[in-house]
């Protein structure tokens, strides 16, 4: 199951849908436990606040969910460089790390500022290229090499 989490002003995390657009009214930890009870076999946990920023994973969120459930958790949102993948895989009890920005932001860095992203959802982010400077683009082969060198299992 995929859980999209947004941190609230009180420090809690609420579950959202539709790329963080729609509130569910469910607190993330409670929802993670419920989906496990309902038979989910794995959770893809996205920090909407960190997604696409390159600022690093939300360790608090990922750690809380991993401690709350007995099913595998895949961390997603915030990876800015290959070393972030290594750090998450080493420091947190996750079953995997989902990445995207470090693989494709090179194209956005050099795209036309007047490009029309209206159907993409996060329009202001894409048009302003906010935080793209924190993304260190890489190739899958380089990321795999780094992980293998550090004896981190890859699929």
Task: State the predicted function of each range.
Residues 2-11, 51-66, 81-86, 106-114:
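Active-site-adjacent beta->alpha loops and helix N-cap segments on the catalytic face
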Residues 22-39, 56-70, 79:
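Short loop-to-alpha-helix "cap/lid" segments that border enzyme active sites
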Residues 31, 61, 84, 139-142:
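Hydrophobic alpha-helical segments typical of transmembrane helices
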Residues 3-5, 47, 77-78, 100-102:
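Short secondary-structure boundary segments
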Residues 60-99:
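Catalytic cores of alpha/beta
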Residues 1-51:
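Conserved anion-binding
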Residues 89-155:
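C-terminal helical cap(s) of enzyme catalytic domains, especially alpha/beta-barrels
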Residues 1, 35, 43, 65, ...:
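Conserved, mostly hydrophobic/aromatic
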């Amino acid at each position: 199951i995929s859980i999209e989490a947004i941190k609230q002003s009180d420090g809690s995390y609420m579950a959202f849908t539709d790329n963080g657009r729609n509130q569910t009214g469910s607190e993330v930890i409670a929802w993670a436990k419920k989906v496990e009870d309902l038979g989910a076999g794995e959770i893809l946990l996205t920090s909407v606040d960190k997604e696409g920023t390159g600022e690093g994973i939300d360790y608090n969120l990922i750690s809380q969910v991993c401690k709350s459930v007995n099913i595998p958790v895949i961390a997603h949102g915030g990876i800015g460089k290959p070393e972030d993948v290594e750090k998450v895989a080493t420091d947190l009890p996750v079953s995997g790390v989902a990445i995207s920005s470090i693989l494709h932001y090179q194209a956005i860095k050099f795209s036309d500022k007047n490009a029309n992203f209206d159907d993409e959802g996060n329009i202001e982010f894409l048009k302003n290229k906010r935080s793209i400077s924190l993304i260190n683009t890489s190739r899958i082969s380089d990321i795999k090499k780094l992980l293998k060198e550090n004896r981190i299992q890859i699929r």
